[in-house]
């Protein structure tokens, strides 16, 4: 009996390792395909760019706002430094505005807030150096809900809020607009409201409609 238990435990561990390896490879392949795709798409003058991770990628922004000038440059799994490596197109294009949300994947892989914010500042400075006239909007990172989270989150809403406060303070130094989404998505327990998410991290259609209501005034002014 003991040998059967040990065999079963080993089988579960090996299966989990292979599953994790599969999803890691799948995410890496998806990432490289998206980067390759974006590198072959011209950014037209006056475009409005949404850039970030899967939360950005999963929205059809141009349809949401009925605006063909909006383009999506989100990639699932991306981190701050990943976005920094993807913005070379700003050197040779003239988009009107850029909406940025990034950082939750850094937090969920265990990066400390100080390190994330240091990379974030370098990213924003790089954006402004490449395109000084661009209208830059810095989204707060959204809250999470640990009760419905897939797996065990490393990030906490307390750490997210602390990073958001740093981003807000920094935005004023960079002539950027800070967009507070965080507080709008909270429930009474100060977690991501379940009506906007089914996994505690990503948002659903209702969530994107709320996001639209918060930023539509900025889109209309561009």
Descriptions of predicted regions:
Residues 20, 143-222:
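Catalytic His-Asp segment of secreted/periplasmic serine-dependent ester chemistry enzymes
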Residues 113-123, 156-163:
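Charged helix-capping and loop-helix junction motifs
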Residues 71, 137, 177-179:
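General small-molecule cofactor/ligand-binding pocket signal
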Residues 131-135:
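A short helix->loop->beta-strand "cap" motif at the edges of active sites that frequently abuts
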Residues 22-25, 67-80, 108, 151, ...:
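Acidic/histidine-rich helix-loop elements
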Residues 1-49, 57, 61, 220-222:
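N-terminal secretory targeting modules
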Residues 50-51, 56-69, 80-118, 126, ...:
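Oxyanion-hole/transition-state-stabilizing segment in secreted/luminal serine hydrolases
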Residues 41-44, 64-65, 92, 129, ...:
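Extracellular/periplasmic catalytic domains that process cell-envelope and extracellular macromolecules
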